Amino acid sequence: MYKRQEYPDCEVVVIPGITAASSGAAVLGAPLNHDFCVISLSDLLTPWERIEKRLIAAVEGDFAMAIYNPSSHKRADYLQRACDILLSHGAKEDRACGYVENIGREGTKAVTCTLGELRDAKVNMFTTVFIGNSQSEIVGDKLVTKRGYIV
């Protein structure tokens, strides 16, 4: 149990749940197999320069990515900026990607696309974006990052 000094009588309880990355990945297919990372594009608490470094490290490490907070009214171009960073650091325009809007809610919408198409996608704060690694593929309407198993 953790107690903060400012509120010594307040107990913090952690309840395990399923992240938007995991639940969105299940809707989209299997984009987060092998190694992956989760990056938020919100610069409210993290400077954009640090977010940019994380994006560069992820693409240079060939990680599949789940992207939270891809766009808002004040940050309408952040997903486009993120895609431009990935493209300028080695990702190809045809890299397999996708996104899921309203995960677990009425009106869930899943879309597969390329990184080039994702750059111009209209997304919102209810959207989780998935960017495959260099081995990811779009199979039918699913985004799949293979692990190398032969089935």
Where do the PLM segments sit?
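A contiguous loop/helix-start segment that scaffolds small-molecule binding in enzyme catalytic cores
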Residues: 60-151
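Class I SAM-dependent methyltransferase SAM-binding "motif I" and its flanking Rossmann-like core
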Residues: 3-61
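Generic detector of short, aliphatic-rich beta-strand segments that form the cores of beta-sheets
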Residues: 1-2, 129
